[in-house]
Curated annotation (Swiss-Prot):
Protein name per UniProt: Regulator of telomere elongation helicase 1 homolog
HAMAP family for the chain: RTEL1 (MF_03065)
Domain Helicase ATP-binding: 7-326
Pfam families, sorted: ARCH_RTEL1, DEAD_2, Helicase_C_2
Protein family (similarity comment): Belongs to the helicase family. RAD3/XPD subfamily.
GO cellular component terms, A-Z: nucleus
Molecular function GO terms recorded: 4 iron, 4 sulfur cluster binding; ATP binding; ATP hydrolysis activity; chromatin binding; DNA binding; DNA helicase activity; DNA polymerase binding; metal ion binding
Binding site for [4Fe-4S] cluster: C148, C166, C175, C211
PANTHER family per the UniProt record, alphabetical: DNA REPAIR DEAD HELICASE RAD3/XP-D SUBFAMILY MEMBER, REGULATOR OF TELOMERE ELONGATION HELICASE 1
Residue numbers of Phosphothreonine PTMs: T875
Gene3D superfamilies: 1.20.1160.20, P-loop containing nucleotide triphosphate hydrolases
Reactions it catalyzes: ATP + H2O = ADP + phosphate + H(+)
Residue ranges of the motif DEAH box: 254-257
Native source organism of the sequence: Drosophila grimshawi
Amino acid sequence: MPENIIAGIPVHFPFEPYDVQRAYMEKVIICLRDGTNGVLESPTGTGKTLSLLCSTLGWIRTRQSEVQLNMQKLQHDQQTQLTGAAGAGAAMGSEIAAVIGKSNNWGVPKVIYASRTHSQLTQAMRELKRTAYANMRAVVLGSRDQLCIHPDVMREQGNSNKVNMCKLKVHAKSCTFQLRVESKKDHPDFRGPSIMDIEDLVKVGQRLKMCPYFASKELVNSADITFMPYNYLLDPKARKANKIELSNAIVILDEGHNIEKICEESASVQIRSSDVAIAIEDVTHIMKIFTSSSDSQDTAGPDEPKDFTIDDLTLLKEMLLELEKAIDGVIVDNKADGATYPASYMYELLGKANFTHGNCATIVALLDKLVQYLMVASQHSMLRKGGSFMVLADLLNIVFANKGDIMSKVSCSFKVHAEIEESKQSQTNNKAQTGWLGKGNNNAASSASKTGRIINFWCFNPGFGMEQLLNTHVRSVILTSGTLAPLKPLIAELAIPVAQHLENPHIVNEAQVYVKIIGTGPDREQLISNYKNRDNPKYISSLGQTILNVSRIVPDGLLVFFPSYPMLNQCVDAWQASGLWADISSRKPIFLEPRGKDQFTSTMEEFYQAIRDSKGACFMAVCRGKVSEGLDFADRNGRAVIITGLPFPPLKDPKVILKRRYLETNRTRENQLLSGNEWYNLEATRAVNQAIGRVIRHRNDYGAILLCDARFQDASQVQQLSKWIRNHLGARPQSSPFGPIVRELRQFFKHAEQTIVQPVERAVEPVLHTICSKKEDQLTLAPITQIKREPGNTGTSKFQLASELAAKVEMANSIKTWTPADYANAAGRNAQSPKAPNPMDFMSRLNSNVTSIDFNADSGRDLVKIHKRERSSPTFHNESMGSKKRYRLINNIAQSELKEAPESRADFLREVRSVINSDQFRSFGKALLAYKTGGDDSFETLMLLLLDVMGAPKLRYLLHGMRRYLKNEHKSEFDVRLASLEAAQL
């Protein structure tokens, strides 16, 4: 790759950098060289991530070379000085060099690259793989939910349950994957030169039968660059657990427009009355174990840690009872709005139960011991896992992290907000039914019928989180994003010294972007999505007509962003009732942003595939949602974006009210903080800027930006838009009549298609990967958890297949990445003949050749159906079946029921979902997940479920179709079971 000298450092860049990229890299290198901090804004599509990685790692590589030369010189000098004792001198010189080599690369800083989501981190790692620095040591830290490969853990619902199950197995030394980490961590496949993202770690872990989650931690110490989400970086406990050392480190905070909120959240905490009540019950439970074991054999087991006494438990229980009494006594006069108290009130509340700065560390240590004790004790019962103790420990750690010498700062930066919690009696009953609570003592039981409280300790000063980071003695902090402006208030709120700052222009020219404010719809109804107008049916209809007209002009992908989910749902319902939904769908298939992670994955797959259709597709999403924050809609995936309104935070939300009040109270001319109103408006505009940034993704991209809200004409709103967007709107932006906009938009796309080089689609990669990696021809099972019918009046309903292991769909940057042909059919858009199956798609392995002969196609009388099934399993052998045709009489079955299992994966799943109930389908998905990584036991479980769910004659065709999903070693047994079932019913 070409080498460029930037700020005196050789930087390898994939091409000759543009001026904006060179300016950006120069600022980065100056920060690293001088050990200072920087706040750098560069619009989405200017190559920000690539510039950031190349400049940072270019400086690191130069520093490594300098250190290596210094080390060689030192070794040479020492050997020269010790020539009098040649043998000893050489040995000592080698020893010193070895020690130096282990000491954190002897002064070479490590790079910590943090972003908001794993989706963004994966995109960054993909950029790194394309650079000359792809051979540098890199690791990504992920959660158990993403990295764990233990089938028992992955069967658990919810991240907290997975964490607890993992901890139980690790503590009991029963996780074979974790036990292999020590012996496999130096394996060439794991320590190889290639950069491994989440997906790569999982694949290597499965191949080596080694835990990817714990193995990734082993790479941190030797990595040149470590990728992680914000919470891993800002949470001291997470840093310790993941062995993250920040001293002399370079910290990069990418997508930093969220950093203020994340810093505030990292210093905030919540406790409920029910949390304390459960903690009391848990302590009582442990005390009972202690009491019963004093007169008999230890009932809890000899391996449980007992480095605490019954006196410790008694004292803790007394404190918890007092804390429960104090929390329940908090006065909340207005149940709807709650009650707000100064920060000191939290310390008074805890002080009533004798929780103080002085004993905080001791109590937290005791709580950690109790959690470990309960985890071991609950291995068999799985009733108590110490979750309440963890909540209490978090509360104490966060509240008492603020030392007494900064209490004046705490008092103006924090507030206590109390709310009413639902009846503790109902919660207690629910918990008791699941075995979570014991009977407890009389005091706890007597308070169970009282109304509980939720106590929030909210931080409104993001400087607290940044101060913790700076106190670790990092070398440099680089905060960067496409939407940081205005920079001065941001820097003031974060309270960090900033030596370098930058606001870059965009690299695209005027002919590549069309930006317009649409103040009225085709019917001349004003488009304004304020609170008063959102229920106006004329406005909603006009907005739908606007989207319909735009969908007729925009080629390929159209993105439509709404201010909130309620507004999106309201519009969808109204358009379905009026027929507008069907009209838009006839132009472009519509995809809605789902709120669940699993559904989101499959929806994005379907959207990317639909883009290949000549009509393209329309994706309706929400500002601040996953689509607006983390996804890339380059080229055909997003040719236009419609912003339907300004996504202001809820005006009456207590946290919003208190944040505005905090800014007004603490704002001075010197600190340049925003006013409460300015912050409120900026929150909406930053979300808009993020949504707009999904479209223009690179130098040769083009697209239209349509702001469909009359309020965008206000000068205050325009000034908060990204600088490059303001340049396209002009000095005095005004909305234009709808007719001219339609003509201009049509002309814009016509000109762009003629003058701008269209992207060349690369060969696609298979979406789904195999489970059985030993043999290429072995069958694979992707997890199937839920299929959801999208709302709509058209006859082409869309189905969403959720896939927990297909998280890489969130990372799809373009249609170049995805080509599963069955998604088009799943959406009901193509009724064409099926194409040849993709051998890498597990559903395409439905390769048992089946022929059906209907001897009575023209009548409704008794039908005879002949099946000839050629077994695909090389291990299958049954002389009784051989090549002999099997005849089966099917009495009085309607013509519509004579059918085979659908060939395509999506159609098959749609068929299954349509004929069984939701509980059966949920069990079906779980059984497939278990079978995916399990052995004979999991096959037996799956087989029993299939016979139960699909054993009826009318569903037998689905049971036959399921054979195609099985691993080769289980097909023979499946055939025997199926033959027995059919013989019994003849």
